[in-house]
């Protein structure tokens, strides 16, 4: 039985690799709807010097995965966190149970989203 109405995941996904796919699958086991926040091209340039694929390309690829129900753009912040995405989803779905599930580059020590306590459960190392 799925625990949450919505599970939020986020990342650059530039390019998508098997670790991302495992995260998508893991997120889908937690909730009925998976919302994937894709970081902006500007965020990718700041993180790694360039964007391999544009936001539009990454979004189209992400939307094709059966585990992802919706892809959202969100405003990047100075920490590279998905806090603005969490706020955006919570405003769009105020009556839903929501979890944020991430993996990859994030750990308990470098995840600013972990401090976001506005009714959203937090999972690290999803998938």
Which residues does each PLM region occupy?
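Nucleotidyltransferase catalytic core that binds NTPs
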Residues: 1-127
């Amino acid at each position: 039985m799925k625990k949450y109405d919505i599970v939020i995941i986020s990342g650059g996904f530039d390019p998508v690799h098997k670790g991302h796919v495992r995260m998508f699958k893991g997120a889908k086991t937690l909730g009925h709807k998976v919302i994937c926040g894709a970081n902006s091209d500007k965020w990718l340039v700041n993180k790694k010097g360039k964007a391999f694929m544009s936001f539009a390309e990454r979004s189209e690829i992400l939307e094709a995965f059966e585990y992802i129900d919706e892809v959202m753009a969100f405003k990047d912040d100075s920490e590279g966190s998905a806090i603005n995405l969490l706020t955006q989803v919570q405003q769009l779905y105020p009556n839903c149970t929501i979890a944020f599930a991430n993996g990859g580059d994030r750990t308990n020590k470098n995840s600013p989203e972990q401090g976001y306590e506005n009714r959203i459960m937090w999972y690290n190392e999803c998938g």
